[in-house]
Swiss-Prot record:
Pathway: Lipid metabolism; malonyl-CoA biosynthesis; malonyl-CoA from acetyl-CoA: step 1/1. It holds the Pfam family Carboxyl_trans. The lineage of its organism: Bacteria, Pseudomonadati, Pseudomonadota, Gammaproteobacteria, Enterobacterales. Its EC number is 2.1.3.15. GO terms for cellular component: acetate CoA-transferase complex; acetyl-CoA carboxylase complex; cytosol. Belongs to the AccD/PCCB family. This is Acetyl-coenzyme A carboxylase carboxyl transferase subunit beta. Keywords: ATP-binding, Cytoplasm, Fatty acid biosynthesis, Fatty acid metabolism, Lipid biosynthesis, Lipid metabolism, Metal-binding, Nucleotide-binding, RNA-binding, Transferase, Translation regulation, Zinc, Zinc-finger. A zinc finger (C4-type) spans 27-49. Zn(2+) binds at residues 27, 30, 46, 49. Residues 295-304 have a biased composition (Pro residues). PANTHER family: ACETYL-COENZYME A CARBOXYLASE CARBOXYL TRANSFERASE SUBUNIT BETA, CHLOROPLASTIC. The gene is accD. Residues 23-292 form the CoA carboxyltransferase N-terminal domain.
Amino acid sequence: MSWIERIKSNITPTRKASIPEGVWTKCDSCGQVLYRAELERNLEVCPKCDHHMRMTARNRLHSLLDEGSLVELGSELEPKDVLKFRDSKKYKDRLASAQKETGEKDALVVMKGTLYGMPVVAAAFEFAFMGGSMGSVVGARFVRAVEQALEDNCPLICFSASGGARMQEALMSLMQMAKTSAALAKMQERGLPYISVLTDPTMGGVSASFAMLGDLNIAEPKALIGFAGPRVIEQTVREKLPPGFQRSEFLIEKGAIDMIVRRPEMRLKLASILAKLMNLPAPNPEAPREGVVVPPVPDQEPEA
């Protein structure tokens, strides 16, 4: 027996360890491989390059509001395919697919609760639901959020992440721009603060309506914010756009937004601002949250 055969006879094969899917993920910016649980504890912010990844609507609201205080609003509202719209796929099929993928009925989630003990109403977009596009249900839920803020005499916060108006609802989608803007006028008349938080991306009809109507417009770092996208603009003007065009840092230099706030600092910053605007005691800084625990969304059958 040769020495190679002797070595081979002493080698015991081992089974390949099976790693469940979703345990690891990769940063979209720097390519760093990240432990999923650690990334969630860091509010979907890359610990290496500080890239702010997209966050689900429910995770965002649960990371903002005080635990045990959240009450969802407008969950009974569901989208309808009244136009029987069809492009490469039926609209009702797109809705069913998005509902199955995200567990949400539509692209906006609204909740009321407390922020450091202060009553607030908060709304957040679910970008994974048809690109966070604004349809009639998104508009109706936003108006519901405004009405609740007026009823409770409290501030409203909205986290935008949208590609714009939903083309499958045509004019009914476009009219939400006026509808939501008119609702916010009531907040202004009452003297109640509305803070708009612009996340990546905030585009189209959403950026052209309530997303830019905040008493304070705050953006996350490097968020893409605008009406038409950079590629569309370049093709139209036939010129190369400057580096960082339509990003948060570019917009704050031009005076289009008020401030840029990192996601881990957002909760305390919003509470501090609202306390001043509402003439309330400043919040006491607390230790960083250990993570976000989100209750499962109840099973739902998409409408045929």
